[in-house]
UniProtKB/Swiss-Prot annotation:
Family affiliation: Belongs to the UPF0312 family.
InterPro entries reported for this sequence: Lipid/polyisoprenoid-bd_YceI (IPR007372), TTHA0802/YceI-like_sf (IPR036761)
Protein name listed in UniProt: UPF0312 protein SA2479
One Pfam family this sequence matches: YceI
Domain of life, per lineage: Bacteria
Signal peptide: none
Annotated source species: Staphylococcus aureus (strain N315)
Disulfide linkage: none
Length: 171
């Protein structure tokens, strides 16, 4: 069994969504945690739970961030966390239950396992993964949108994300 200690200082969770049919808005969730258990040498044994604090959303625009925290989007007063619980893990895919605003759907995401390295600062063993994927926000009750007079809509329904997580590990 491998002991995993999440290193939030060296991890990130970023997203992007199409805006006005012509560009993308990017942002991040600045507060999240990932708990992992299992054997790093046997992916089939790995179980992980990610917990994201949606009120930590950061698009570098306070007014937009406040709107994203409102009931039009994440409803952070009522729904204070987003969770992802794995069902299966392979070297390049993860399947699990994603819960946003109390709505749970099974999702499959791509995984890039980056091996194990020794941290020269403290001698600890570290590992990291990058998880990428796309979710349909409307599947989670995030339906806010506005029609554009030129056709199309203000916001795309697909949200792309990249999560990079680093862990100290020990046996």
């Amino acid at each position: 069994m491998t002991n995993f200690t999440f290193d939030g200082a060296h991890s990130s969770l970023e997203f992007q969504i199409k805006h006005l049919m012509v560009s993308k808005v990017k942002g991040s969730f600045d507060q999240f945690d990932v708990a992992v258990e299992g054997d790093i040498n046997d992916f089939s044994t790995l179980k992980a739970t990610a917990t994201i604090i949606p009120s930590s959303i950061n698009t570098k625009n306070e007014a937009r961030d406040n709107h994203l925290k409102s009931g039009d989007f994440f409803g952070t007063d009522e729904f204070d966390k987003i969770t992802f619980e794995t069902k299966s893990v392979t070297e390049n895919k993860v399947v699990g239950d994603l819960t946003i605003k109390g709505i749970t759907n099974e999702e499959t995401f791509d995984v890039e396992f980056n091996g194990v390295s020794k941290n020269p600062m403290d001698g600890s063993q570290v590992t990291g993964v990058i998880v990428t994927g796309t979710i349909n926000r409307e599947n989670y009750g995030i339906n806010f949108n506005q029609a554009l007079e030129t056709g199309g809509v203000m916001l795309g329904k697909d949200v792309k994300f990249e999560a990079s997580a680093e862990f100290s590990i020990s046996e």
